[in-house]
């Protein structure tokens, strides 16, 4: 970072809303955040204790639940603070750096993980007899590690390009968390090259992952159409539709915010709610809690807790 950086703290403008809605929004987002954390913790616990769920699909789901729990934690608590009092809008320079890094780290890792999960479902549906050998434990670990390392590299690029510039004047960020586009608008230097590199970097990651996901689901649909029973096709299509809704809730807002021409405006904070608040809450429901195997495991865990002496 530049030694010319004089700004020691930033002020977050928060989520755009009418002044009288502070208490209502605080209550809503607090409940959503608590449900998100508890839902993802439950998924992690259930998959951990039930050996029947120790499969590649649930291995990736544990990674997703872990990411979602912390992805929401990176932004939502600070957003709640901005709704409580004006002093809650302040964030130190170094805290802002950390928030931006972990936001992009977890967000891009989730992006890569969606791609891996769609590939896993493609193999499971298209090659059911060879699936176990094709998705061995070592291969699952390698794919998961690759998503985390790729996310870390992507985030490092975003953070370095954003904060190596000098910040010596305005310090009001038009957002409810620290993100690259609104922060770059405050830099005391030409940001055109930085904006272009960030645009290309995010564009390659987002569009590349989305194209691979679409190709995987097109192949899955082709495989589903070859299923002879109408009930089997219906259930498979319902599962794919649910997964696609979550993917769209994550990718479409990202495209709107990061890959559109023009500068960021205040309403982008509202759009960002979809992937910072809504998607982490939906994932436990769509990917696991609607699954019969997980429901059965949850009931078994409940019985163990309620009747610990039963065998």
From Swiss-Prot:
Biological processes, Gene Ontology terms: detection of chemical stimulus involved in sensory perception of smell
Q: What does this protein do?
A: Odorant receptor.
User: What does the UniProt entry say about where the protein is found?
Assistant: Cell membrane
Q: Which residues lie on this side of the membrane: Cytoplasmic?
A: 45-52, 120-138, 217-236, 290-311
Instruction: Show the Pfam families listed in the entry.
Output: 7tm_4
Transmembrane stretches, start-end: 24-44, 53-73, 99-119, 139-159, 197-216, 237-257, 269-289
Entry membrane topology? Multi-pass membrane protein
Q: Which gene encodes it?
A: OR10G4
Q: Organism source for this protein?
A: Homo sapiens (Human)
Entry superkingdom: Eukaryota
Per the UniProt entry, the disulfide pairs are 96-188
* Ranges of the Extracellular topological domain: 1-23, 74-98, 160-196, 258-268
Task: Give any GO molecular function from the UniProt entry.
Answer: olfactory receptor activity
Which terms in the GO cellular component ontology are assigned? plasma membrane
- Glycosylation-annotated residues: 3
Broad class of the protein's primary localization: membrane
The protein in question is named: Olfactory receptor 10G4
Keyword annotations from UniProtKB, A to Z: Cell membrane, Disulfide bond, G-protein coupled receptor, Glycoprotein, Membrane, Olfaction, Receptor, Sensory transduction, Transducer, Transmembrane, Transmembrane helix
- Family as reported in the entry's similarity comment: Belongs to the G-protein coupled receptor 1 family.
């Amino acid at each position: 970072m530049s030694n010319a950086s004089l700004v020691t703290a930033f002020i977050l403008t928060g989520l755009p809303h009418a002044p009288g809605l502070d208490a209502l929004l605080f209550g809503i987002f607090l409940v959503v955040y608590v449900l998100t954390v508890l839902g993802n913790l439950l998924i992690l616990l259930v998959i951990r204790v039930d050996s029947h769920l120790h499969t590649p699909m649930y291995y990736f789901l544990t990674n997703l639940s872990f990411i979602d729990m912390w992805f929401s934690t990176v932004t939502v608590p600070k957003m709640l603070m901005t709704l409580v009092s004006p002093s809650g809008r302040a964030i130190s320079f170094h805290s802002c750096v950390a928030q931006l890094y972990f936001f992009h780290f977890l967000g891009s890792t989730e992006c890569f993980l969606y791609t891996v999960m769609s590939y896993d479902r493609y193999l499971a549906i298209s090659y059911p007899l060879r699936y176990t050998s094709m998705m061995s434990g070592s291969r699952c670990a390698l794919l998961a590690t690759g998503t985390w390392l790729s996310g870390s590299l992507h985030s490092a690029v975003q953070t370095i390009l954003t904060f190596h510039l000098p910040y010596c004047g305005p310090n009001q960020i038009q957002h409810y968390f620290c993100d690259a586009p609104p922060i770059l608008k405050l830099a005391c230097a030409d940001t055109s090259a930085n904006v272009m590199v960030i645009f290309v970097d995010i564009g390659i990651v987002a569009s590349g992952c989305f194209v691979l996901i679409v190709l995987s689901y097109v192949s899955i649909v082709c495989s589903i159409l070859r299923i002879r029973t109408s009930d089997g096709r219906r259930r498979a299509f319902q599962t794919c539709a649910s997964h696609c809704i979550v993917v769209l809730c994550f990718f479409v807002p990202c495209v709107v915010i990061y890959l559109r021409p023009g500068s960021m405006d205040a309403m982008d904070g509202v759009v960002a709610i979809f992937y910072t608040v809504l998607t982490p809450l939906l994932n436990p429901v769509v990917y696991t809690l609607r699954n019969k195997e997980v429901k059965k495991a949850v009931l078994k865990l409940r019985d163990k807790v309620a009747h610990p002496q039963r065998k």
